[in-house]
């Protein structure tokens, strides 16, 4: 699992635009496309329906949305929890 791919998925779902997601994430549009493609390949389903400049979540993308939000929340908590004891030890 690539946490950056999950975050990219959430940003594309939010903005409904690969270019806008790229700008928000400070990466290139090709990086966004590659991350989404990789995620789709690992899951085995298309996550977005792409129609003439319009992007929307596919049924699989909608199903992934809740899990993706949970994953990023847990990841942030883990980072905070792991970083906190280290910071406390350094200040002693």
Residue ranges and their predicted role:
Residues 40-57, 62:
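A short LG(V/I)-centered, amphipathic sequence patch enriched
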């Amino acid at each position: 699992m690539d946490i950056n791919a999950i975050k990219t998925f959430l940003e594309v779902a939010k903005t409904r635009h690969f270019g806008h997601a790229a700008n928000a994430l400070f990466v290139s549009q090709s990086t966004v496309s590659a991350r989404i493609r990789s995620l789709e390949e690992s899951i085995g389903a298309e996550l977005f329906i792409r129609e003439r400049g319009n992007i929307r979540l596919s049924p699989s993308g909608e199903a992934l949305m809740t899990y993706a939000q949970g994953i990023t929340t847990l990841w942030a908590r883990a980072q905070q929890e792991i970083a906190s004891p280290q910071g406390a030890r350094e200040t002693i």
